[in-house]
C-alpha cells in the first residue's frame, strides 16, 4: 500500500506537495516517516542518485529525482518496487507539465498542495488489484529496478552521510569490479600468448633439429 507521497525541490529541500494516507491508525505512525522524508530532502543534492530505495523497517521509501524535483513515496515493504517507481514516474510527468516552470520561483512550502487531488487519484489506480496487474504487464519500458541503489534510511540520516557519498561508494565498487574483470581478462590473454609462444618455440626447435640431424 502507498502510505505517504511527498514532492520537494532538490536545491533546498523545500516541500512542494504532499499526500498522506487518511487512515487514523496509519496517521499516528506516519509522522515519524514524514519527518524522515523531510530530513532526507535536506540531504539531497545534484550528485545524489536519481533513483533510490531506502529501507525503513516494515516500510520502504522510494524516490525519483527529475529536473531538480524529488518525488518520494512511502510504501509497505511488500509493495512491488516496479509499481512504486512507475507511480513516481506518473507523478513526475503530470507535475512537471502542470507546475514544472514555476518550481524554481516558489518560496512558500507546499505551494502546489492542490496537486494532492491528482496524487490521490493516481494512488488509487496503483493500489487497486486489477490495475496493479495491468500496470505490471504494460510497464515494460521502466528501467531495471534491480539496479536501483538500496540503503537504510536510519543509517543515511543518523550518520549524516549525504546520498551522493553513498552513490560514490557504489560507483567505486562498480569501478573496482570492472577493473578486476579487465585485469583478469588481461592475465588470461597473457597466459594464452605465453602458451602459444611456447608451442611456437618448440615447433621451431623441432624443425631445426630434424633439418640438421636427419637431413
Swiss-Prot record:
Alphabetically ordered keywords of this record: Coiled coil, Endoplasmic reticulum, ER-Golgi transport, Golgi apparatus, Membrane, Protein transport, Transmembrane, Transmembrane helix, Transport
Transmembrane segments: 191-213
Protein name: Vesicle-trafficking protein SEC22b
Family: Belongs to the synaptobrevin family.
Organism: Xenopus tropicalis (Western clawed frog)
Ranges in the topological domain labelled Cytoplasmic: 1-190
Gene: sec22b
An example Gene Ontology CC term for this record: endoplasmic reticulum membrane
Topology of this chain in the membrane: Single-pass type IV membrane protein
InterPro entries tied to this protein: Longin-like_dom_sf, Longin_dom, Sec22, V_SNARE_CC
Keyword Ion transport: no
Keyword Nucleotide-binding set for record: no
Compartmental location: Endoplasmic reticulum membrane; Endoplasmic reticulum-Golgi intermediate compartment membrane; Golgi apparatus, cis-Golgi network membrane; Golgi apparatus, trans-Golgi network membrane
Gene3D superfamilies with a match to the protein in the record: 1.20.5.110, Longin domain (3.30.450.50)
